[in-house]
UniProtKB/Swiss-Prot annotation:
Belongs to the major royal jelly protein family. InterPro entries: 6-blade_b-propeller_TolB-like, Royal_jelly/protein_yellow. Transmembrane segments: none annotated. One of its GO terms (cellular component) is extracellular region. Salivary gland (at protein level). Probably modulates blood feeding of sand flies on vertebrate species by binding and sequestering different mediators involved in the host response. Binds biogenic amines. Binds adrenaline and noradrenaline with high affinity. Binds serotonin. Binds dopamine and octopamine. Exhibits anti-inflammatory effects in the host: reduces IL17A, TNF-alpha (TNF) and IFN-gamma (IFNG) production by host lymph node cells, suppresses expression of MHC-II and CD86, reduces TNF-alpha production and increases IL10 production, in host bone marrow-derived dendritic cells (BMDCs) stimulated by lipopolysaccharides. Keywords: Secreted, Signal. This is Yellow-related salivary protein LJM111. Pfam families: MRJP. Residues 1-18 form the signal peptide. It comes from Lutzomyia longipalpis (Sand fly). SUPFAM superfamilies: 3-carboxy-cis,cis-mucoante lactonizing enzyme. It is found in: Secreted.
Amino acid sequence: MKLFFFLYTFGLVQTIFGVEIKQGFKWNKILYEGDTSENFNPDNNILTAFAYDPESQKLFLTVPRKYPETMYTLAEVDTEKNSFESGDTSPLLGKFSGHETGKELTSVYQPVIDECHRLWVVDVGSVERNSDGTEGQPEHNPTLVAYDLKEANYPEVIRYTFPDNSIEKPTFLGGFAVDVVKPDECSETFVYITNFLTNALIVYDHKNKDSWTVQDSTFGPDKKSKFDHDGQQYEYEAGIFGITLGERDNEGNRQAYYLVASSTKLHSINTKELKQKGSKVNANYLGDRGESTDAIGLVYDPKTKTIFFVESNSKRVSCWNTQETLNKDKIDVIYHNADFSFGTDISIDSQDNLWFLANGLPPLENSDKFVFTKPRYQIFKVNIQEAIAGTKCEKNL
């Protein structure tokens, strides 16, 4: 390793709106356990998303291969051995335990853990850029893969390769949600994957090993989004990006809430329509969150009936209780910090903790080259009920 990196230190706990928000991990550069090639450049490794599993105490992280030399596109941190409570806030990323070489996947952007304790990723099948003199990764059709976290060494249990030409521009796939129709019947599962360039939703039917594309006018941007960095303002346009699922009805159907990256509106579609190939979808307009609330990530908590949004340029995390009509007056803020640059991922673990990530990477060309004087990658953790206590989102608890 020829490059030296400096980690900035600051408090592990920040008090925002009366609640302690624990900063889990922070990195200014992403480095890996083990040897790296002489072509390794940590600036080419961009952390995009994560999923935490309390049972194994593993934090799974995705680092898409923008360049082939990225060591692991799916990595993990053992939080029992590398505990941020004990001050180990910038651990090296290790190889995913279900892999032998770390080269089993070409490039992934997000991990999701479902109710059957499976870890899902979408391997987009291609590297964004090529570097001269570096052995390239094999290219293939986008592939959906799941691993069983209940078993030792996390064996691969699902692999579905999407048909030729069924997904346009796979490196522009955004977030996805895994819909286990009946928690006690894991075979009946659907996956909904967003594409923020083509403004489409890709549906995978696991039971029938089939997939199809859904499009709707509400999936596209309705304005230009702004991103401020280092005294300059940038603009971008991106379509449907974040998606989360509400509560099941008696037939196992739910509302799929979704965000368009360049919009402040929120919509939903009943999964009954998404699960029927060729069915016409009827999008529900739920309301507008207000000026400068653009976001690409959201998550629904069934216990508090609250949706949390990790916002793009406001440097904050907000909430809305779904029992209320959505408008700017019903939105509240649970976290705000000037160093939180471009919130990109948010999730809830099985112990009712809310986790969220900023990575300073808006969908702008060469945004991976932005320079940060504070840690670029910041992961935070907070108990949900503590987070919404005293806010507009606390209702009927």
